[in-house]
Amino acid sequence: MSEQLSIADARQAEAIGRQVVLQGWVRTRRDSKAGFSFLELNDGSCFGNIQVIASADLENYEQEIKKLSAGCSVSVVGLVKESPGKGQTTEIEATAVTVHGLADTETYPLQKKRHSFEFLRTIAHLRPRTNTFGAIARVRNCICNSIHQFFQEDGFLYIHTPVITTSDCEGAGEMFQVTTLELDKVPKTEAKVDFTQDFFDRPAYLTVSGQLEAEIFACGLGKVYTFGPTFRAENSNTARHLAEFWMVEPEMAFYDLEDNMRVAERMLKRIFRDVLEKCPEDMEFFNLRIDKTVIETLEKIIDADFVRLPYTEAVDILTASGEKFEFPVDWGTDLQSEHERYLTEKHFQCPVILYDYPRQIKPFYMRVNDDGHTVRAMDVLVPKVGEIIGGSQREERLDVLQQRMKEQNLEPEGYWWYLDLRRYGTVPHSGFGLGLERVLQFVTGMANIRDVIPFPRTPGTAEF
Amino acid sequence: MSEQLSIADARQAEAIGRQVVLQGWVRTRRDSKAGFSFLELNDGSCFGNIQVIASADLENYEQEIKKLSAGCSVSVVGLVKESPGKGQTTEIEATAVTVHGLADTETYPLQKKRHSFEFLRTIAHLRPRTNTFGAIARVRNCICNSIHQFFQEDGFLYIHTPVITTSDCEGAGEMFQVTTLELDKVPKTEAKVDFTQDFFDRPAYLTVSGQLEAEIFACGLGKVYTFGPTFRAENSNTARHLAEFWMVEPEMAFYDLEDNMRVAERMLKRIFRDVLEKCPEDMEFFNLRIDKTVIETLEKIIDADFVRLPYTEAVDILTASGEKFEFPVDWGTDLQSEHERYLTEKHFQCPVILYDYPRQIKPFYMRVNDDGHTVRAMDVLVPKVGEIIGGSQREERLDVLQQRMKEQNLEPEGYWWYLDLRRYGTVPHSGFGLGLERVLQFVTGMANIRDVIPFPRTPGTAEF
């Protein structure tokens, strides 16, 4: 009997001589005058195809096999042989080809020619069948797995923080509202929406971050991380913004900012190393077709120590650089992308962890330094992308935290439980957030963030 | 220098003789007349505590150590020694105890006495610090990790299907609406809501299932799984319903219903085996305090073959059983929980996979059998919980699928891309859904689903 094999396995030398069943989708068909056809078959298990040799002797050769075109689905039974061809180790000599589904060449939207990414977004249900989007799916899977393994091996607990929330982590942030009220007849009492008739008896939103809830678990169970979807209702139509994206947020009790930096650096290096090791074919494709620097960039980062630089020194470096920036550099304002890129690409030529930012530009939960002017914030900057991680040591002192909330006009009532964490058994703790899609953009070189998530949600777009 | 160690590691015999730093929260303090105090310390790394012996010679003994109570946070430096006490391998002789945060015994809500789970839900920010909820967090983490490993080892790709959606997988289902319109002044044109002013230019909802999108990826990349939050806006105040819960949905190209059953059975056994192996202390606790049958039940399932039983035969068995059921058994209606429990608990005394359900009670996407009356649906039933997995082979034939949609009054326009999967290179494929919280209830014996998710969302409740 023939054994079921993935094409990834069938392409290895070890498969030679085995009688197998392969199942997948035809990429191309080429007919030889010598009385057989070559099918390039892909099943998603790897970037490369396997070549199937289908002889004219097969009973359905004329009626079916010769009609196969890009997108058709087949099962192939046959013998794996050493391939005489270049760039492939094996090929399969078919003894049977079963056709499951055809794909009419007149109407099938994926033609042989190269399609623009813009066009492919309109057929997001078919784009996983292309080389580029198959590769993105595998690299995305690899990175997710790498993240989980990194934390699991280090004793972190994976926790699920809620998507539906009634609190707002950043104190600002544009949020989506979640409701079961009928929008064409919203109930009101005294001209105000009557939320007692809504599902949760109060206004509810989609979370912008699981950090505050992750702190709950860290402040009782030590080391935890979240990995889930987060949301921004910003009307940003850029290549770097999504309304729905995935975020990883580790949070560690008894970790200070230096510990936090070490976790962030180790995690990024682990991700990059895994991608290069486990997806070499996919990465070669990105390096060849999308951005000729991606592999070299990742390799350099894996070997380099990240620079640690206080914000204040960064401002000094930028001021003294003689560089012409569009935006002025001024202590007390956020750095712009051009400044971040100057630091990582020109000045240091490696990732930089900026820390100790001005108090007034950072959220209330970041720990205030003894100088009173700065807080224990950190941003990890990488070449080309800029900020890829943002984090901080959290303010664990109840009185200082309350003072900071007052400064930022936050109502303590909504944060009673967050304050309780400081009231009972408070501990120094730290954490950060990593946007999965930003990492994917960095790793693959893909210019538009809409192309590294299966089904992008952006203003006006929620198809599929 | 002392090395940082988790309490899980410090409790092992290998730690004896090492100079360590432990950090965590005090569970209890007991003072000996012999001039020292015993602290039970927990850091979340495992169920058990470590006993810290703090001598009166320590400089902060009177001022600080003797004030320690449940919930206080400390760092302890000391030597790990063999413990003369029963039920513990090691203990630590402190050379320094640093107090990070006290927890006023007058106001700290977690007192020594046992609290009801209802009460603990009102302090969900503190309940991870209890034995029960620490154990749940570790078992939940273990199960999530087990699920990822199971699929990763088998070549599945983890994919993220969207939370915000404009389609409704089940064709029915009560959904939450997602909007950026201001509810107190919803814009209207001709008495209808003007969705062109909403974020996505149309009504958008929270997903009830990622299945249809998972099918997209399976029908191009082979074997995939989703693992993410899903939502139901049902007004169900039961111990088994949540408005927000996590679901795992594998989807496999070229898999028929029998293949699907095999994946489901293997996955459940893998989860149960991992939990028993990796969380033995936590499971002993559940077995002792929550449900005295959980360990035995899991062990039996791991060793048993799941029974496969067509729905029609199940109806025959139930009808012939002589059992008095509250609801009548009738071919063509859904089985009730009492029927499912009779089959798994009394008749077979093991998990049962029911399959080939009546066409009229199942969704449009399930493959129609040759008999015309049944579809290739399957439900995995386990003792006590009943249905834990629901799945099916999907209808891959375009014409049959279109006919089924017509039967169920579904508009094909909304499903153009789903139909395209059958139009171009269609393949037999199958998948199922597993509710994470149901599994957790089954594994731990916890009666209420609100206690196995960090922050439950239910009608009227979205605190934290």
Regions found by a protein language model. Name each.
Chain A
Residues 164, 174-273, 284-464:
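A translation/RNA-centric and nucleic-acid-associated enzymatic feature enriched
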